[in-house]
Amino acid sequence: MEAAGTERPAGWPGAPLARTGLLLLSTWVLAGAEITWGATGGPGRLVSPASRPPVLPPLLPRAAENRWPEELASARRAAAPRRRSRLEPLSQASRGEIRTEAAGMSPEGARWVPGIPSPSQAGSARRTRRAQPPSPLERGDSWATALADGAKGSRPHTKGSREEVRATRTGGASTEELRLPSTSFALTGDSAHNQAMVHWSGHNSSVILILTKLYDFNLGSVTESSLWRSVDYGATYEKLNDKVGLKTVLSYLYVNPTNKRKIMLLSDPEMESSVLISSDEGATYQKYRLTFYIQSLLFHPKQEDWVLAYSLDQKLYSSMDFGRRWQLMHERITPNRFYWSVSGLDKEADLVHMEVRTADGYAHYLTCRIQECAETTRSGPFARSIDISSLVVQDEYIFIQVTIGGRASYYVSYRREAFAQIKLPKYSLPKDMHIISTDENQVFAAVQEWNQNDTYNLYISDTRGIYFTLAMENIKSSRGLMGNIIIELYEVAGIKGIFLANKKVDDQVKTYITYNKGRDWRLLQAPDVDLRGSPVHCLLPFCSLHLHLQLSENPYSSGRISSKDTAPGLVVATGNIGSELSYTDIGVFISSDGGNTWRQIFDEEYNVWFLDWGGALVAMKHTPLPVRHLWVSFDEGHSWDKYGFTLLPLFVDGALVEAGVETHIMTVFGHFSLRSEWQLVKVDYKSIFSRRCTKEDFETWHLLNQGEPCVMGERKIFKKRKPGAQCALGREYSGSVVSEPCVCADWDFECDYGYERHGESQCVPAFWYNPASPSKDCSLGQSYLNSTGYRRIVSNNCTDGLRDKYSAKTQLCPGKAPRGLHVVTTDGRLVAEQGHNATFIILMEEGDLQRTNIQLDFGDGVAVSYANFSPIEDGIRHVYKSAGIFQVTAYAENNLGSDTAFLFLHVVCPVEHVHLRVPFVAIRNKDVNISAVVWPSQLGTLTYFWWFGNSTKPLITLDSSISFTFLAEGTNTITVQVAAGNALIQDTKEIAVHEYFQSQLLSFSPNLDYHNPDIPEWRQDIGNVIKRALIKVTSVPEDQILVAVFPGLPTSAELFILPPKNLTERRKGHEGDLEQIVETLFNALNQNLVQFELKPGVQVIVYVTQLTLAPLVDSSAGHSSSAMLMLLSVVFVGLAVFLIYKFKRKIPWINIYAQVQHDKEQEMIGSVSQSENAPKITLSDFTEPEELLDKELDTRVIGSIATIASSESTKEIPNCTSV
């Protein structure tokens, strides 16, 4: 599980969770150089979720000359970065790939208005676009962005000199060029350096720090470095190498997030291990030697002197004096899985959450205080072991993953409460999960399910993060530069509830928008006219606007989509018009009303930045060619003015706009030529704002959703600057919004957990969900909230209306007898070492946790009892003094009933899977052949342990099959355990024993196969659904029907018609009744009356497989002694075996023999064997078990599930590498 959207997630396997404000280091290859921007922390802790653009701490300072006169005496307001969401596996998604386009230079002094051919257009011809390939990241815990060298032949700017361009108009009578005032500075002597890290703190400061370095990719280390400092907003720089030590080679620059005057520099570990500390914004430094090598730093979010350091040898150190002294906290810390406490949630400010690995390879979640982290003072909030790299601490939530028996379970703690298991829809069966966001007391998660390969489903949770419901299926995903997952989902900033998503529909990718957090989605309406003013003929749903939603991996470009909290409703994105998303014929589009309507502003790819609270837009062409112009718009992209910002064309490698929304400064990085020094161009926009804004310069804007004024349960009216008003806002300006609640309507509610939407608004229970079953925490005498199938969307502010109708109703807890009792070990193994702790977990599907007594007998003469489940939630530990085989028995009892569960524990060369083959129904007093198929086949000797019913002593064989006779009618349990070396696995099945029965094979409409995950629970639930459908149509008694769904594809089943439970002496009459029931069922099936709805829009029809109905099978002497019947049986068996061997690939139900399924966990019902499909046919008549797993199968095995070769979906076991 991961938090997506960062390069170093601090969450689930494969992608650590990002944290606020840290150093960025990203590579954007143009000519081999790179630049890195330092924000508020260390290189491994960036935050830039895939669901929204990165909102980062201030980049550029505001110069005093940029202030209006009346503002000079006012205090400087710090720009606070907004809270970020993380997309994590929980996995972590990151920004998208970078592309550039080549295009010719536009005529100077041009002003372009959409509707007239733009300067870059030549009639209808389009220039060839050349993709700019993204480069690899320098390190996995930071971003790197290249500063490219320019083309050869250009005159390099004089080293160390300063170029100044003032705001002027130049040119002859026919042309006139607008100029912006700018200054350029060359970093002298660093032309060989290929990396740079830039920090601009803002906060009433004019200081800029730049660390340039030469990174040798062959050696994997930094060989040269230079530190530059500016005190005049980047107009000039001073080289500080003599102040840090001429021989000191620096590798990283860190800035304290709570006090940006405090700077920390790390030396390259290949040279020395030291840290340089400054408390005056880099003017002076103190150097401290270290006894360990730092890999990453994590600053405390509140205390400016508290720092955590992670070393190269996986040890965690702490400092409480900003790196002057260090103390070892713990060893064997999982990389990136350590977190500071969260204010308001953790009791101690110096508490640290960490994931610690033990010597035996397990991981545990521990917490301790930085100065008190001895073994006696540590605590374990989750007592059991967890999966490695699965701890995520994010806002109010803590996530972990635990894998037992090959299937991962996810747990969440909300506001530091006890951990609860995350509830996804029963058959989502995730093989990968990413946490997208934890904003607004709700979790957004992207889940890749068992039948998905390049798409994810979006799920949203309740406030506690436990119950998840489906918001959108098949969202497109891709891989980033470091192999990280990119989920194409984007949250529009400034207005809550609006998301954009790229969904894969029939191999086409289309862009959808929602205004209510995923309850309803619709396609984007294309613009009415194009850039030339010609009508656009694009009709929904066949044609629409599609957008690229990946955020840029280059922090110095605006990215392909951008929106700001400070400019609500304004969205700029790259995309195309058509039937699907295109990567070639693209342009830039803008929406001024939160995505309702769109206009095209460029027909090529541009970077667009927001200035002065969104009142002005700045655009620069995204191209590898040198440029000296940029475009400015004051009317939300309706018209554009072109300005020159440098005298010589510059190969632009990136640009920084100060994070403060009222800024008028931009810094452009680049080179004038291939071998020139690095150029830093400071561009001042102050001159283009003619005056200060007045009341007459503002207008109101109503947020609508296709004309509906109520969005997320309220009407919102924003005040914004009128398009075209060329005025500047003051620093005291704060965007105003008026809102009032709406009456609750259908669209303010989503389906609750366990319910699915049918039609526009009706929520009905899913086939696997029982809405009448209360929580296990519901104790007799208490009350609980019984869902109506609906829940109000989190953060929706509607009132009255349908709120009472859809709200959950309070009901008394009915009290339930224990059911579904299970006893398992914490690691899922059935082997324990003598003298070591064996920890048991008792699980119960239904019952009253508070009023149920529990007894656990360890099988060695020791037993324990508990009055309720509370003391045993973290497991029951026991140490076995001697080796052997022990039957562990769990017994649960309350005043309504009891339940028992068994586990056979061995203290004993690994086998991976055993499949127990037994008939579903057997005849009393007749031998039943039972066999076990082991995968992979073992060359050595295997020992088989067989338990029948409640027997405490197993039958032990060296053969994989056994014959057994059941003496009494009823349901019997059969368990087999296979021991190979020190490994032990088991399978359990149930068999129904009767005097006689009849059976019939069933098949289904083909659409069921696509939705068949081929796991035991699904087969059991589908069997129950078929049984209910048969009873509904025929009114046959429930206890006389048994439906068993077979493993494998195509999906098939067997219908058993059983005698009544209370069999009397009138046997012949009952046999006649059985024949009548068979005829009734057969007629209903042949008339296609038996069908069920699997999910909305998926109707499944049940058919009779066209084979002869099996005759009555019983245990009477008359039947077994009939010579004629025996002769007919022999003939029929021979014919059947021949036909099966000859045509088994063509008979649908033969798959139940040919496909030995390696199920994801133990079967819940018995699987097919010799007697359920044709009378008197035994397993020996079919292929040997070894052949079942070998050449005769026309199947492929992916993960551990066999599927038909023609199947289009790939089935995999959910992997345990990312939660």
UniProtKB/Swiss-Prot annotation:
PROSITE patterns: PKD
Protein purpose: Plays an important role in modulating synaptic transmission and plasticity in the hippocampus, probably by affecting the trafficking and localization of AMPA-type glutamate receptors in the postsynaptic density.
GO biological process entries: learning; memory; postsynaptic modulation of chemical synaptic transmission; regulation of long-term synaptic depression
UniProt membrane topology term: Single-pass type I membrane protein
Lineage, highest ranks first: Eukaryota, Metazoa, Chordata, Craniata, Vertebrata
Stretch list, region Disordered: 71-181
Residues passing through the membrane, by range: 1123-1143
Domain of life: Eukaryota
Gene: Sorcs3
Segments in the Cytoplasmic topological domain: 1144-1219
Keyword terms, alphabetized: Cell membrane, Glycoprotein, Membrane, Repeat, Signal, Synapse, Transmembrane, Transmembrane helix
Disruption phenotype: Mice show impairments in synaptic plasticity, particularly with a loss of long-term synaptic depression in the hippocampus while maintaining normal long-term potentiation. Pronounced deficits in spatial learning and memory, and accelerated extinction of fear memories seen. Significant reduction in basal synaptic transmission, particularly in the CA1 region of the hippocampus, with more pronounced effects observed in young adult mice compared to juveniles. Altered short-term plasticity, marked by increased facilitation and reduced synaptic depression during repetitive stimuli.
The species this protein was found in: Mus musculus
Protein name (record): VPS10 domain-containing receptor SorCS3
